[in-house]
Amino acid sequence: MSAQNLLVEIGTEELPPKALRKLAEAFAANLTAELETLELAHQGVSWYASPRRLGLRVIALDAKQQDKEVEKRGPAIKAAFDADGNPTKAAMGWARGCGIEVKDAQTLETDKGAWLLHLAKVAGQETKTLMVDVINKALAKLPIPKPMRWGANKTQFIRPVHTVTILLGDELVTGEVLGKQVSNQLQGHRFHHPEKITINHADDIFDVLKSAYVIADYEQRKAQIRAQIEAAAKAINAVVAMDEDLLEEVTSLVEWPVTLTATFEEEFLAVPAEALIYTMKDDQKYFPLLDQNGKLLNKFLFVSNIESKDPSVVISGNEKVVRPRLADAQFFFESDKKKTLESRLESLDSVLFQKQLGTLKDKSARISELAGYIAQQLGADKELAQRAGLLSKTDLMTEMVMEFTDIQGVMGMHYARFDGEAEDVALAQNEQYMPRFAGDSLPTNLISCAVAIADKFDTLVGIFGIGQAPKGDKDPFALRRAAIGALRIMVEKELPLDILDLVAKSQTLFGDKLTNLNVSTDVFEFMLGRFRAWYQDEGIEVDVIQAVLARRPTKPVDFDRRVKAVSHFRTLDAAEALAAANKRVSNILAKNDITSEGNVDESLLTDDAEKVLAAQVAKFATELAPLYASGNYQEALSQLAGIRQSVDSFFDNVMVMADDEAVKQNRLALLSQLSGLFLGIADISVLQK
């Protein structure tokens, strides 16, 4: 069966840049699913996209479906014929529907009886006759939250559609898609090639579009922009801090990228670099430039969508556009410096954090107290932590942050320095929000850690305390991010803080505002759940995590040490046998209602195997105590692996459930002590092969 490459392109008005990749990928996935449903074989579906088009290419798509036989089961034999062997009305009606006589039907024999059967041959349809319906279905399933109508057309899509092209090899597939007749006409570049262009073969798509000033291949266009930016920066001995999200967005904004260099007045460099960078990147989609020491230069790169005969005009235009934005930032900065952060505390009372939990001023006071409490436990300066916590939300009341919300914290740091606050206090204004996302940096000092943890626990305890835990995908207060952020800080900075202790302290700071009496348990369970998700993302086996969760450690750094110890233990030769033995011990103790360790009476030890095991258990109990106390669980489990032979010998030679009740209870006490050695770290009985 012959196969041809398929081309599908939807030409539109400018598509939302941040949604472009998602739309194209979904379009490809939807078409792939539709082709699979129709059993049309091919060698792959790929997408391309630009601001004014969504395109798909299907390699070696079969020209038609395979012919196939379809089983059409009729009535049961018992119901198909009467007592005289004549076909019943049911049988004749079924046969008529199949286009046959009852006598021509076959019989299907099964365990449950026999039925009439007809094997109908169904001819496969030609691909070109199916494509319009397939494309319409694939487009209808795109993730478009707010589709729009245009003109007198009742069709809805993300943006108005101007062209639809479907080519199977060199053959045009006819029909209507999104209210437009399919044609072999494509849109070129809006300015460089405003006329429609004709394409005669699916394989020519990239060459045809390139002739019309469109680099259609998304990844090729992205790579070209990256190379242009790096070359332009290198040409002036500058460094570009490549922002992948910005690069992605710019790729979705242009069809014929041309990178140019522009400048702005040096006086603007007196404004904190973060504010200028935010303005250039987020507002204007420019790429800021740094010198070799990482200091912001008064130059930037931008990617134009036109290849101008006079680039200076384009450069001048962009410089004129950015200048007022930089001037605004300069004005806000100078204006904000006229008031100290401390003087803005009262204004926080006018901003609600959450209706039941009070204002941002209330939250700042709670953060201050909790940060001081945490700092004290860490041996850090309590007063500095309290001061940093008190000022932590004041920059939200500055003009700069009100205008550029994403630079909250970093502006607080700059203003705190200008106010003469201690450097640790200033740094904490920015680092309180760390980590902002997965893989982000953590606070750099203990004061910042204290404030960051305090802020996150205040939110967790407060929101759980009023019964608004996350449900499904809904997490309006970003509690999952707060929990994993606090855990990361405590684990990676090795801070010996206790979750339940912090929750209890935080609870007291809310007074009578909290209505959930189970807030402590709820927050703890939620954080254990975040631990599980974190470690699974890190590739830790689920049974290792469960082994540690069974012991419910309340200190994150302690939890982490146990997980690492059990992960290492799993690699030892003795691990599998000891896990099985512990499971056996656990079952024996459970059946005999043994819930605590008993004392072993040496005079009742009669078998050599139990004497050896008892001696080893006593020896390990003494020798491992310092390792448990210091959290050196990996070494403790490594040493415990040496008890395997004694455990195996015990179960091979000793009858635990002895007839003598005293001997039985003594042996149960020994097993309880053995179990306790491992349970001091984790429940290794849950480990699997």
UniProtKB/Swiss-Prot annotation:
GO terms for cellular component: cytosol. The keyword Aminoacyl-tRNA synthetase applies. One of its GO terms (molecular function) is arginine-tRNA ligase activity. Keywords: Aminoacyl-tRNA synthetase, ATP-binding, Cytoplasm, Ligase, Nucleotide-binding, Protein biosynthesis. It catalyses: tRNA(Gly) + glycine + ATP = glycyl-tRNA(Gly) + AMP + diphosphate. SMART domains: DALR_1 (SM00836). It is found in: Cytoplasm. It comes from the Bacteria. It is an enzyme of class 6 (ligase). GO terms for biological process: arginyl-tRNA aminoacylation; glycyl-tRNA aminoacylation. Gene3D superfamilies: Isoleucyl-tRNA Synthetase, Domain 1 (1.10.730.10). Its EC number is 6.1.1.14. HAMAP family: Gly_tRNA_synth_beta. Tetramer of two alpha and two beta subunits. Belongs to the class-II aminoacyl-tRNA synthetase family. This is Glycine--tRNA ligase beta subunit. It comes from Pseudoalteromonas translucida (strain TAC 125).
